[in-house]
């Protein structure tokens, strides 16, 4: 059973070899790695082609134009030859037995989706380029799914129960740490929406609500870089705020369209609003409120790019929507920017100490 590992790449010279090497070093050997380059302007393509010239399982694919990680993942999905597909970012890593555990679960259950419940976060600051060099005792096991199972668990077929689980935080929206049956994706025409953010949440949710056999395994297998230069962890500027606002509003439109096409949701349309609110709240708490706090209302109100986003989605009602939004955010208590390096260290130091004490 071949597994296709798809890795979107853009200007990742510092980290990509370490990420790909973590795949090449897997105990499960029947895989291919599709590195899909999104028109990098650095030496990423060159170093990958040179480093893996004698490794036939690793292929570098060049996009014709820069179109973002969603388009890169979609291209990889089109070209994938494996029976299953999984994803890894070009600055993350995977434990050596990751694909073996994925394959074992898939073979036992014939799953459409295999879903791990957490991630491993390096408890060092700064995180080294070679994320695989972080000692095991410095990796914090972050079980993101609430009420995560202790053993391999097949979700009920009841889609309403799956929606309830999603709303309760049981199934997170990341695509790394999950593996998808290729025919399931193709038969349901499941692809990533062309959004700057939240496209992974929309994709994962659509898979959750369309899958036949959906399996959770109680593992944290992906080593995830919390602090980096990706869009979701970018510098808090008016331009960044415009991007996350556009992603949130645009994602809301796309998600509503995709939910409306799911048979169960068609029969129970009351779920649409509840899901939209849940996803918007997640974007709000993690991205929008921290950025609003740092950028400030004055800079946000006067920015042409941000005003254009409001006008594009709300037309003549943009002024009222902006005022309501800004007034509400002025009244909210401050929330931490979880992706700043200083707060990152403070946030995880005690948790890492507690974890190591329990394991010891």
Regions picked out by a protein language model, each given a short descriptive name:
Residues 11-25:
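Short, well-formed alpha-helical segments that are part of the catalytic scaffolds
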Residues 219-228, 234-264, 285, 289-317:
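Catalytic core of nucleotide-sugar-dependent glycosyltransferases
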Residues 22, 37-47, 65:
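A conserved acidic beta->alpha catalytic loop
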